[in-house]
Structure formats: C-alpha cells, structure tokens
C-alpha cells in the first residue's frame, strides 16, 4: 500500500513486575460456575501460551535494561506486524481535546494496538475499556473502566469513568473509545456473514459535543474466526472464553490499521447527538474501502 509503513512501537515506562495476571476474562465478582466455565475454555484455547510469551518478552526487557510499555511488550511478544500510514498518524493533532473512535472487530488486540499507536501520537491519551482489563497494573494509568455488570457498583464505576473522560477532554486531553462496547459479531448464527459492530453508544457523540473535541477515526480491518462467531450465538461465556484463542490465531500475522484524517470540532458543531453518532460511525467504516472482512 502506498505510503504505508510498518513501525515498531516506541518503548515507554513500565512498572515493576507483578504476579497479577490480565490474561483472563473471568471476573472475580462472577459466580464460581461462570469463572470456571470461562477459565476452562481459555486454558483449552491458548491463554496460558499467550501469557507465557508475554512474560518471557517482559523478562527480556528487564534483563536488557529496557523500559517497555505493556502495549509494546504485548505486540513484541505476539510478533504482530502492525501496519499503518505513519504520515497520517503524525498529522493527528498533538494537543487539544481529541476523541479517537474505532470499530472493535477482535477484542483485546484492538485495544493493545490502539494504545501503542496513541503512545506515539498522543501520550496524554486515556481509553474507555472493559473493567476486567484493569487487573493489569501496567494498564491502569491509561484505563477508564467500563463495567458491564448490572449492579449499583458497576453503575457507579461507569458514571465516574464518563465524568473523568469528559474532564480529561475539557483539559485538552485525548480519549479513545470503542463506541460499540462489544466485539463485532456476525448476524448469522453460522458466521457466514461479515461481523460488524452492534449499536454504538451515544456517549461517543456526547464526548465530542460536550468537550468541543476534534475526532480521529480509525478502522481495524478483519474479524474473529467463524468459530468465535458461532460461539457468540450459543452462549456469552463461550464467547468470552474464546477471546485468547483469537489472539493466538494472530501471532506473527500482519495487523493492518486504517487511520483517517482528523477533523476539527467545527465540522460537527451543527449536528445533534444522534446525527453525529451516525456520522462518526460512517467516518470509521468509510475507511474500510472495498476490503470487507470475510469469515474464516
């Protein structure tokens, strides 16, 4: 692709080693049966292998005296070939309120690659993400947790994260959001149709309008396996358990990222929230061009 370059992510500070493991979607607050079910599928589908790769690469960095970020270490451990247009990333606003919006086809890989890119473009970024990932101490400084449990505590966490996101933008910072909240899924029970994001949260548009922020659209081509698509229609626990299977499938693979042109708030000032949300989604999926993901 013309102008596209493969970049190695720039090392950044990382905290001391820890025994805490971010390599599971089983929430300690879930019922025992649910944690066991998710954990069993994860063990069978490669979570331990991925954790071992990460820990080995992390230890290499400490032995060599390198200070790598969690995101850089994860990309290196998985041998991901992250491909993107470096010129477009450089053109992203380096200061001032900026909302980065993206589709969510894979899961944790979307977040890891996105954060690695933002370390280069906007070191002041925060990302709204699944609260389960807060178990990784290396990620906590960047994360604004979103809890999907239907509890008062989850509601409290989500309200606080949204308030922090708005405050950060109003202070001139950058916030990353995957407005679908959940990973893209094929509407077909047999996974024959392309996976696509579900309905986007209006909060993405609210962030832009309330903070008078610019927007940077990013599109991740591709989708998870047909097995994942089928499992998603069978049971949510089976779906959760397969996320690390999907990560393992992509070890050593190209990981293309389509970066759009940033737009200033003036381009959206006249739009109401509903229209803006539709426009934001169109900006992201408009980067797909003719390369639509196909089930594999």
Q: Model regions: which residues?
A:
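Membrane-anchoring hydrophobic helices of lipid-metabolizing enzymes
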Residues: 2-101, 111-113, 120-122, 164, ...
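Catalytic core of membrane glycerolipid acyltransferases/transacylases, capturing the structured
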Residues: 51, 99-155
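Residue-level "edge-of-site" marker
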Residues: 88, 131, 221
């Amino acid at each position: 692709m013309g102008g596209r370059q493969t970049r190695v992510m720039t090392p950044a500070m990382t905290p001391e080693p820890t025994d805490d493991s971010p390599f599971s979607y089983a929430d300690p607050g879930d019922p025992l049966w649910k944690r066991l079910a998710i954990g069993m599928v994860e063990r069978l589908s490669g979570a331990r292998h991925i954790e071992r790769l990460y820990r080995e690469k992390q230890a290499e960095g400490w032995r060599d005296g390198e200070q790598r970020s969690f995101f850089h270490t994860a990309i290196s451990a998985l041998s991901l070939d992250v491909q993107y247009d470096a010129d477009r990333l450089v053109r992203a606003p380096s200061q001032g309120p900026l909302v980065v919006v993206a589709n969510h086809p894979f899961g944790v890989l979307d977040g890891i690659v996105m954060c690695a890119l933002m370390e280069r473009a906007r070191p002041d970024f925060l990302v709204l993400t699944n609260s389960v990932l807060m178990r990784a101490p290396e990620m906590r400084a960047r994360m604004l947790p979103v809890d999907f449990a239907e509890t008062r505590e989850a509601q409290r966490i989500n309200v606080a994260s949204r308030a922090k996101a708005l405050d950060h933008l109003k202070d001139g910072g950058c916030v990353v959001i995957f407005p679908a909240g959940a990973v893209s899924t094929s509407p077909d029970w047999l996974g024959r149709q392309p996976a696509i994001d579900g309905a986007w949260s209006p909060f993405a548009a609210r962030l832009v309008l309330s903070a008078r922020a610019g927007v940077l659209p990013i599109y991740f081509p591709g989708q998870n396996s047909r097995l994942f698509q089928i499992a998603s229609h069978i049971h949510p626990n089976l779906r959760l358990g397969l996320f690390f299977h999907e990560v393992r499938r992509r070890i050593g693979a190209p990981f293309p990222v389509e970066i759009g042109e940033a737009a200033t708030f003036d381009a959206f000032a006249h739009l109401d929230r509903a229209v803006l949300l539709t426009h934001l989604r169109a900006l992201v999926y408009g980067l797909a061009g003719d390369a639509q993901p196909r089930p594999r």
